[in-house]
Structure formats: structure tokens, C-alpha cells
């Protein structure tokens, strides 16, 4: 009976240990890469940087702009809890027809201070849709940026713990005030802007001894205690 109670107590202790959240901290960098297509007359600037422009401006001060903005001072959270890694901003400039690519990738790197796991770098594709402007209906002339929605996890094993790092998606979407933007797409009028925050999460899995192994360990400890009492 006492052994059952001890086993139950051990199980509760293990569950409690697994439920303890560990600190997560680090920094994020993002760079826009691989505009497609990229050959002339497609016009782009900022490839390899955090600010990407595309198209030849026609009627607005600048062409279209996508920006990645890392969290100032880096991110700080705990495991199992989503945290903000940065934000995306979009400005819809008016551009000449035929000068805009169809997509661009964001190379996003999460560099961890805690836990001590390697940096995670992944590429995410943003679809760019430039609508021909008719000048009659600003909503019909609005452009789209389709946000990535599929995020795979990257796993690392340190000791007996598996760390899974995964983007969870976009939140806190702010549209241009006229059209609805969401976590799937920015839909923005000419000369308008939209933004969204990007979140990630680190989850853990810790190897737990099998019940039989725990029982054997406790039995061994019991025998040691019995021998110690006899010697005493």
C-alpha cells in the first residue's frame, strides 16, 4: 500500500516538474529574399534587408513596401506560451503595370539566448497581388499581400528534453481603415497601410522513466534502506 502511495507521489512530482515553464529569450532578424520573378522590367530594392520595395512608383511618392520589424530588445517569455517575434508592415503604393513580382520570401531567424538551442531560420512566402487601377472605385483598385499560413516546427534534443520551435501565426492585425485585413491577407487601398504581429512558441517534451523503471528504482532504494537498518 505504501509503495502504491510512493508511486503515486512520484507520478505527481514528475507531472509537476513537466508543468514548470522554462524561460525563453533571444532576438529575431528578418530579410526579404527571392522575389519572383526578378528579371526586368520587374523593379525591386532592399533584397536581403528588412525593408523590401517593389514596382516602379506611379503617382505615389514610393512604390509598394514590405517591412519586417524585430521586437526592440529581443523577445522574452516562457515555454508553452506564444511570444511576439516581430511585426510585418505593408504600404500599398501605386506602381506601373508589369513592374511588380508575384511573391517574395521572408527569411526569419530566431536566435535563442535561453534555452541554449541553435538558431532557427526558415523562409516564408508572401504572395503579392497588384490590381490594375481603374480610378473609379478605390476598393476595387486595392491590392493584396497574402500572408503565409502554414508553419512547420523545428525540433532540437538537449539531454532528455526535446524543444519544438514553431511560428503560431499573425495577430493584432491593423488594416487601412477601409477594407478588412486578417491573418491570411492584407487588403489595402492605394496609399494605405496595414500591419500585423508575428508570434512563435517553444514547447518541450521531457523523457519520463517508465513506471516499471520507477518501481525497480524504489525497490532498490528500499533494499538499501533495509540493509542500512540491519547494519545499524
Regions found by a protein language model. Give the residues of each.
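Short, threonine-centered small-residue motifs that mark membrane-proximal processing/anchoring sites
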Residues: 5-24, 197-226
Amino acid at each position: 500500500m505504501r509503495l502504491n502511495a510512493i508511486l503515486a507521489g512520484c507520478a505527481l512530482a514528475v507531472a509537476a516538474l513537466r508543468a514548470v515553464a522554462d524561460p525563453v529569450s533571444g532576438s529575431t532578424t528578418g530579410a526579404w529574399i527571392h522575389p519572383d520573378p526578378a528579371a526586368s522590367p520587374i523593379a525591386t530594392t532592399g533584397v536581403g534587408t528588412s525593408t523590401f520595395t517593389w514596382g516602379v512608383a506611379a503617382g505615389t511618392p514610393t512604390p509598394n513596401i514590405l517591412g519586417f520589424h524585430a521586437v526592440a530588445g529581443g523577445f522574452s517569455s516562457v515555454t508553452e506560451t506564444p511570444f511576439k517575434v516581430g511585426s510585418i508592415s505593408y504600404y500599398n503604393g501605386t506602381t506601373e503595370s508589369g513592374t511588380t513580382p508575384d511573391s517574395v520570401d521572408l527569411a526569419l531567424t530566431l536566435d535563442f539566448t535561453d534555452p541554449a538551442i541553435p538558431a532557427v531560420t526558415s523562409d516564408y512566402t508572401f504572395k503579392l497581388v497588384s490590381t490594375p487601377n481603374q480610378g473609379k472605385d478605390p476598393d476595387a483598385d486595392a491590392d493584396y499581400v497574402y500572408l503565409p499560413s502554414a508553419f512547420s516546427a523545428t525540433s532540437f534534443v538537449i539531454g532528455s528534453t526535446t524543444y519544438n520551435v514553431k511560428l503560431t501565426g499573425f495577430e493584432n492585425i491593423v488594416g487601412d481603415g477601409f477594407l478588412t485585413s486578417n491573418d491570411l491577407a492584407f487588403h489595402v487601398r492605394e496609399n494605405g497601410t496595414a500591419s500585423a504581429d508575428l508570434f512563435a512558441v517553444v514547447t518541450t517534451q521531457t523523457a519520463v522513466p517508465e513506471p516499471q523503471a520507477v518501481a525497480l528504482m524504489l525497490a532498490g532504494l528500499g533494499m538499501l534502506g533495509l540493509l542500512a537498518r540491519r547494519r545499524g
